[in-house]
């Protein structure tokens, strides 16, 4: 498969069909993205049952003869300041996604980006200094506004230049994940990053 190079770099680049020519597997991508967000949940909620609330060891009044309903503790769930009947417990929300599934989801997403013409390939992409103005101008030349920039390795100048631009992010191939790839309108990727994707996912 050949992809057209964008910008001043005329020509095409050949990529592997095994990485960029797969059918879109919506259910798999959904599962991987759901697992990604689930792993970010804290799950630290906690409440106390009647046995965990402080106090309540003494019987409030005797069992019989008062005319009142019997009571064994002031920490009954029926009482104010009592325990919770079915108290919430800390919970681990992580879902298992094995390596084979993750790689298949990444291939599926990259292939769909190619089909939708949302993958913009350039020979190289860098700025002379960590200046936002420079990066905005370069993105404008490529007609890009909301974009994820993927390079082979993190370029510190590029990273600093992008920090103050809303809806623009810079990651290297190792940090590119299914959620970041689907979140942006366009994904700008260098040829060297493409080769790294092929090596990583092939």
UniProtKB/Swiss-Prot annotation:
Keywords: Ribonucleoprotein, Ribosomal protein, RNA-binding, rRNA-binding. One of its GO terms (cellular component) is ribosome. GO terms for molecular function: rRNA binding; structural constituent of ribosome. It comes from the Bacteria. The keyword Transcription regulation does not apply. GO terms for biological process: translation. It holds the Pfam family Ribosomal_L4. Residues 56-67 have a biased composition (Basic residues). Residues 44-67 are annotated as: Disordered. Gene3D superfamilies: 3.40.1370.10. Part of the 50S ribosomal subunit. One of the primary rRNA binding proteins, this protein initially binds near the 5'-end of the 23S rRNA. It is important during the early stages of 50S assembly. It makes multiple contacts with different domains of the 23S rRNA in the assembled 50S subunit and ribosome. Forms part of the polypeptide exit tunnel. Belongs to the universal ribosomal protein uL4 family. This is Large ribosomal subunit protein uL4. It comes from Chromohalobacter salexigens (strain ATCC BAA-138 / DSM 3043 / CIP 106854 / NCIMB 13768 / 1H11). The lineage of its organism: Bacteria, Pseudomonadati, Pseudomonadota, Gammaproteobacteria, Oceanospirillales.
């Amino acid at each position: 498969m050949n992809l057209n190079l964008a910008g001043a770099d005329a020509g095409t680049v050949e990529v592997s069909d095994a990485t960029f020519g797969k059918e879109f597997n919506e259910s798999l991508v959904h599962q991987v993205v759901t697992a990604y967000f689930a792993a970010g949940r804290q799950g630290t909620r906690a409440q106390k049952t009647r046995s965990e609330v402080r106090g309540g060891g003494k019987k409030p009044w005797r069992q019989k003869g008062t005319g009142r309903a019997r009571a064994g503790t002031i920490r009954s769930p029926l009482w104010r300041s009592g325990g919770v009947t079915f108290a919430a417990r800390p919970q681990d929300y992580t879902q298992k996604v094995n390596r084979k599934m993750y790689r298949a989801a990444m291939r599926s997403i990259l292939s769909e980006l190619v089909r939708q013409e949302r993958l913009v390939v350039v020979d190289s992409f860098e700025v002379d200094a960590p200046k936002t103005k420079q990066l905005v101008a370069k993105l404008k030349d490529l007609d890009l506004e909301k974009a994820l920039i993927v390079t082979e390795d993190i370029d510190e100048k590029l990273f600093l230049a992008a920090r103050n631009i809303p809806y623009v992010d810079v990651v290297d191939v190792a940090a590119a994940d299914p959620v970041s790839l689907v979140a942006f309108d366009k994904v700008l990727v260098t040829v060297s990053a493409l080769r790294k994707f092929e090596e990583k996912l092939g």
